[in-house]
Amino acid sequence: EDQNLWYHSWTRRAARACFRPFIGMRLTPNHITALRWAAATAACGFFFRGDMVSGGLLWVGSAFLDRCDGEFARMTGLSSRVGYLFDLIGDIVFNGIVFAALGLGISISAALGGVLGIPGDIWLIIGGLAGGGVFLAGVLAEINEQGMKNDEKTFNGRWGFDFDDFAYLIGIIPCLGGAPYLLIGASIGGPLAAVVIGAKLARKRMAC
């Protein structure tokens, strides 16, 4: 049976290639998820301190590990409800917290010398909007996917990339000096995504 693009995306193929040698060892998917939590926590800490390069590199690593735990679970047959929830909570929580951390880090820089001419307090609001919007979108997406087939997602990918691969940009863009622009974009895109997914859910319920 064919599976959707997300299973065959480049990043998931890379994840399977990297962790296939560990099959049969004591490594479990939950170990990988725990490492992903640690990397994401460290990334948020560096973003909060204003170290965008260190934070960005750690975030890219955590995003890759987020693909690896699920692929390793499928390869080894070690999938579990606890592991699924462990991974899901990390996805939703960290995808929101990272923008709040970026907002705090940029606000400190703004207080010291200004960033794009926007005061530090406003950056806190922008970070809150981005983090809250992305968090809500993640929760609504998970609700929307309940009852869908295992290979179906709220948003589909294209050209060898799945929608979740946008998470890599959260690390790459700050490394290139674009954290303020990323945050502004997320403060618009996050709430907008939540509205779009919420509308999908509303249509589903009205159709029932």
Q: At which residue positions do the language-model features occur?
A:
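A feature for the membrane-embedded catalytic helix bundles of lipid/isoprenoid biosynthetic enzymes
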Residues: 1-19, 88-208
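Membrane interfacial helix-start motif at the N-side
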Residues: 19-27, 82-83
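Alpha-helical transmembrane segments of multipass membrane proteins
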Residues: 21, 38-45, 169-172
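Transmembrane helix-loop junction
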Residues: 24, 74-75, 104-108
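Membrane-embedded alpha-helical segments that form the functional core of polytopic membrane enzymes
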Residues: 29-82
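Membrane-interface alpha-helices at helix entry/exit sites of multi-pass transporters
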Residues: 81-89
